[in-house]
Amino acid sequence: MRLFLRDFFMSMYTTAQLLAANEQKFKFDPLFLRLFFRESYPFTTEKVYLSQIPGLVNMALYVSPIVSGEVIRSRGGSTSEFTPGYVKPKHEVNPQMTLRRLPDEDPQNLADPAYRRRRIIMQNMRDEELAIAQVEEMQAVSAVLKGKYTMTGEAFDPVEVDMGRSAANNITQSGGTEWSKRDKSTYDPTDDIEAYALNASGVVNIIVFDPKGWALFRSFKAVREKLDTRRGSHSELETAVKDLGKAVSYKGMYGDVAIVVYSGQYVENGVKKNFLPDNTMVLGNTHARGLRTYGCIQDADALREGINASPRYPKNWKTSGDPAREFTMIQSAPLMLLADPDEFVSVQLA
């Protein structure tokens, strides 16, 4: 990576170099995208056509407008083609901005104007990539939790994208079923989990908790006795959930089911928030078919360079004037979908 960065700093920026840097240096791969959304389908059109995705000939979305924060389903409709919201985070290349120090970076290099400019561009791209990846992960999490989410974007009125999750797959503990009201020394929540899992359209092999949900689950003596924290007996699952960063913790196997705790966060209006609400439990399968689809890049420069169907289009350009200014931007039109939203069961613990 050090040689790559050195060569990158010594050369001028081309789209190919920006794409390579974005892929190698700024890859952002949160839990839900990595585990459940492994297929990618960039389209050459602004619209995503579900019938063109292998195995989704009959899939449709129910799209409803959102007015003053309220979903108006009476004005919505079912469709097999949809134009995703367009996102394009943009930054100015400002020589005065504060830079994050890279590991092993010589601080003397930052005094070199050319080096500093290139480092600023790289830092801008990292922030832009994280902004887009945050949108993708939020869509993915909401698709798994609710089977639907709100789509927003540049010059795009908010709409609700509904994949048709069965109501029985969104469960809220109530009426005496709350785990918080159970005797932690005698109650065994295994039967509850097995009952919830029956609502899934396939086999459940993973449960994802938020930290508070995990604390509630682990408070039962029966859980602590049954949880197998040894490694090696389920290598495929362990491989799928390892090396996911500090926001993910693999807790062990509960029977044939992997237990994972996710504390990933996003930033909204400068405030950090958790992707998973408090006391959330998600039952799913690591082979569920999540789809990363993308509308085409709507940029004349991209078309001229032959870049149309792509998840990302990074660019770096200058504007003439007094003074001239320089900018960076990454463009994308993401739409995260589940081929079968009923492969997941979402439980709000209480």
Residue positions per predicted region:
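Short, Φ-rich (hydrophobic/aromatic) sequence segments
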Residues: N22-E23, D191-Y196, M336
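Hydrophobic alpha-helical segments and helix pairs
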Residues: F9-D29, F156-T186
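N-terminal alpha-helical "arm" segments
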Residues: M1-Y49, P341-A350
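Pocket-edge structural micro-motifs
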Residues: P30, S51-P54, A60-P65, G284-N285, ...
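Acidic/histidine-enriched, beta-strand-rich ligand/metal-binding domains
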Residues: W179-I207, P211-F220, R224-D228, H234-G245
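Assembly/oligomerization interface modules of large self-assembling protein complexes
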Residues: E39-P107
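Sequence/fold signature of self-assembling virion shell proteins
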Residues: R224-A350
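Long, contiguous amphipathic alpha-helices that act as assembly "spine/axial" helices in icosahedral shell
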Residues: V87-S166, D188-D192, Y196-G213, A324-I330
